[in-house]
A protein has these predicted regions:
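Acidic, small/polar-enriched beta strand-loop surface segments
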Residues: 1-10, 153, 165-255, 261-304, ...
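Assembly/oligomerization scaffold segments
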Residues: 1-98
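Well-ordered beta-strand positions in beta-sheet-rich domains
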Residues: 20, 73-77, 89, 105, ...
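Short, ordered beta-strand-loop transition motifs
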Residues: 23-32, 81-86, 165-167, 255-258, ...
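Extended Gly/Ser/Thr-rich low-complexity repeat segments
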Residues: 46-58, 102-109, 276-281
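Short, surface-exposed secondary-structure edge patches
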Residues: 48-53, 133, 267-271, 301
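Charged- and aromatic-enriched interaction segments used to assemble
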Residues: 84-190, 197
């Protein structure tokens, strides 16, 4: 039997009472987020936090079991406080919060992606390093009434990359290029519930149409995948054919494979993060065993227990 424990600090305060903590982390979204729900009252007195906590306060959430130790599940910043609905909710965002600063309007000509990212970091007054796996150059990139966050979001939408912050570094990589640790889940041991569907690749045919804007205003298209499958249209930041084809093949890989779609839910152990790999074992159906890239993890901590929902991406092996 494990004893649940937490250590949550916001600004100069340490929380002693909580109703629930919900943390969402994903390689497919720019920001990791957390929502801390506090009781509306303490010892029959309304809980007053708005005069103690403020937007921009540092947030560190550590959760776990006394017997196994606590893990830092989230680090970020307090974004806003809500007192609606009979309780107090603290909405938090990871270091992407620091990029929500206005950038000057500018039209950049022939700017390399890594240089663009370095410019975003600099204009937001930050000192993050940039680690970028892509080498393409934008013919033209327009910044108009945008924040650093808006620019990063546009880049992510156009290239389909994983963009995230880790160890004072802004990372941008193709999905699955940077892997974390391997986690093991056995349906008979540490999976509380699952929402999984097993598919064959031939049943999930996908045709990806990659579109890119040419200098003369026309749109260039490159098709990848299987004809007759579900058609998906995506944008590409560059208009050279190899880059467009690679972008399309990446999307096909994400969507078409023999394996599971969906998620599994376990407990706080093992610790699993987005970009980790998860190996699933089912003694009843060993042919379905496989290793998957983790795209998202939702962690919930309350009086009902600690749960971790792990969302599976493409199959690794």
């Amino acid at each position: 039997m494990y004893t649940m424990a937490f250590d949550i600090r916001i600004g100069t305060y340490k929380l002693c009472m909580i109703d629930k903590v919900e943390i969402h982390r994903s390689v497919e979204l720019l920001a990791d987020t957390a929502v801390i729900t506090l009781p509306a009252s303490e010892y029959n007195h309304a809980l007053q936090v708005e005069d103690k906590l403020k937007r921009g306060d540092k947030v560190i959430i550590t959760l776990g079991y006394e017997e196994a130790g606590l893990e830092t599940e989230f680090e970020g910043w307090l974004q806003r406080i809500s007192t609606d609905g009979g309780n107090v909710k603290l909405y938090c965002e990871d270091d992407i919060f620091l990029f929500r600063k206005d950038m000057k309007n500018e039209v950049l000509q022939k700017v390399a992606l890594k240089d663009l990212l370095a410019k975003v970091v600099s204009e937001c007054g930050l000192s993050f390093k940039v680690e970028c796996s892509y080498s393409w150059t934008y013919g033209k990139f327009v910044i108009n009434n945008a924040t650093g966050y808006d620019v990063l979001k546009k880049v992510q939408e156009e290239c389909g990359a994983d963009i995230y912050l880790q160890d004072e570094t802004l990372h941008i990589h193709p999905p699955g290029e940077k892997m974390g640790v391997e986690c093991f889940y056995d349906f008979a041991l540490n999976v509380e519930e699952d929402n999984l569907t097993y598919h064959r690749a031939e049943d999930k045919k996908v045709q990806v149409i990659v579109k890119a804007l040419m200098p003369d205003g026309t749109v260039k298209e490159v098709e990848t995948g299987a004809t007759g499958g579900d058609k998906i249209e995506i944008k590409c930041a560059t208009n050279d054919e190899p880059s467009m084809k690679a972008r399309g093949e990446l999307e096909v890989k994400r969507r078409s494979f023999d394996g599971y779609d969906g998620s599994i839910t376990g407990w706080l152990i093992p610790v699993c993060r987005p970009s980790d790999s998860v190996t699933l074992h089912d003694a009843d159906y060993p042919y379905k065993d496989g290793t998957y890239f983790v795209t998202a993890v939702d962690t919930e901590f309350s009086s009902a227990g600690g749960k971790r929902k792990v969302s599976l991406g493409f199959r690794l092996s």
